[in-house]
Amino acid sequence: MAWFRRKQKGILTPTEHKKEIPDGLWYKSPKGKIIQIKELKENVYVSPEDGYHVRIGSKEYFELLFDNNQFTEIAANLTSADPLEFIDNKPYTQRLQQAQQDTQLKDSIQVGYGPVNGNSMVIACMDFNFIGGSMGSVVGEKIAKAVDHALEHKAPLLIISKSGGARMMEAGLSLMQMAKTSAKLLQLAKARIPYISLLTDPTTGGVTASFAMLGDFNIAEPGALIGFAGPRIIRDTIGRDLPKGFQTSEFLLEHGFLDFIVDRRMLKATLTKLLTMLANN
């Protein structure tokens, strides 16, 4: 098959004749599978080649779950203050402004209320692109308002977690949100209103240690990293190699921390089945 071999080496195509490949035309999964971005979007950002679930944000989850993407946003304009006047390599206020500019979000969580296959639901979804999906006072307050809305309308609550944990720039105020969100979710339990927690890649730190693991059903996407401290920190602390697949959703399911794993393409149908089953009991 020498048809495509050049007889002369070193022949260069003039720059003006080269065809440019547009940025973002292809996606390469961690396993090396190549897929067109258009096909990836049509497949709700799941690689059809290997099933890899690409990280997405609240915009994409809301488009996937709410019927015709119709929903009412709750507490849309809440933003973090800076009572500690925190500064690391830049002031916290500047970091917030930069994150808001880059993501077009107010903070690392959005809350919406609308129909999911005709059934009303409150959905709170975290965005990892906003300061690592970190949990600060706004996250705690928005989850509290999501619970209040679910109680008022007797609607089930879904929280989609994707976070690096508590936001260090808010220090103790951030850690307080662990107790605040846990206490609010207890109100849902007492009212017998379902709370489903979906853990996605990654869910770690104080988020895992609070609302992410308190669902009536704790479910996860395939291959998600879920834990408190990261695997590198644990390995360095105990001085041992960790089991294969440690802290993946499959590992947690095998050890009883999750109820089941759901493919993102089946998420909406699975939620509907789950809530129908609960409504009939």
UniProtKB/Swiss-Prot annotation:
GO cellular component terms given for this protein: acetyl-CoA carboxylase complex
A GO term for molecular function: ATP binding
Matches recorded under Gene3D superfamilies: 2-enoyl-CoA Hydratase, Chain A, domain 1
EC number(s) from the headed UniProt entry: 2.1.3.15
Biological processes per GO annotation: fatty acid biosynthetic process; malonyl-CoA biosynthetic process
Main subcellular localisation: cytoplasm
InterPro entries (alphabetical): AcCoA_carboxyl_beta, Acetyl_CoA_COase_Trfase_b_su, ClpP/crotonase-like_dom_sf, COA_CT_N
Enzyme class label: transferase
Localization in the cell: Cytoplasm
Location of the CoA carboxyltransferase N-terminal domain: 24-281
Reaction(s) this enzyme catalyzes, per UniProt: N(6)-carboxybiotinyl-L-lysyl-[protein] + acetyl-CoA = N(6)-biotinyl-L-lysyl-[protein] + malonyl-CoA
Keywords of the record: ATP-binding, Cytoplasm, Fatty acid biosynthesis, Fatty acid metabolism, Lipid biosynthesis, Lipid metabolism, Nucleotide-binding, Transferase
Pathway info: Lipid metabolism; malonyl-CoA biosynthesis; malonyl-CoA from acetyl-CoA: step 1/1
UniProt keyword Lipid biosynthesis present: yes
Known partners and oligomeric status: Acetyl-CoA carboxylase is a heterohexamer composed of biotin carboxyl carrier protein (AccB), biotin carboxylase (AccC) and two subunits each of ACCase subunit alpha (AccA) and ACCase subunit beta (AccD).
Matches recorded under NCBIfam families: accD
Family from the record: Belongs to the AccD/PCCB family.
Name used for this protein in its record: Acetyl-coenzyme A carboxylase carboxyl transferase subunit beta
Organism annotation: Amoebophilus asiaticus (strain 5a2)
Taxonomic classification: Bacteria, Pseudomonadati, Bacteroidota, Cytophagia, Cytophagales
Gene that produces this protein: accD
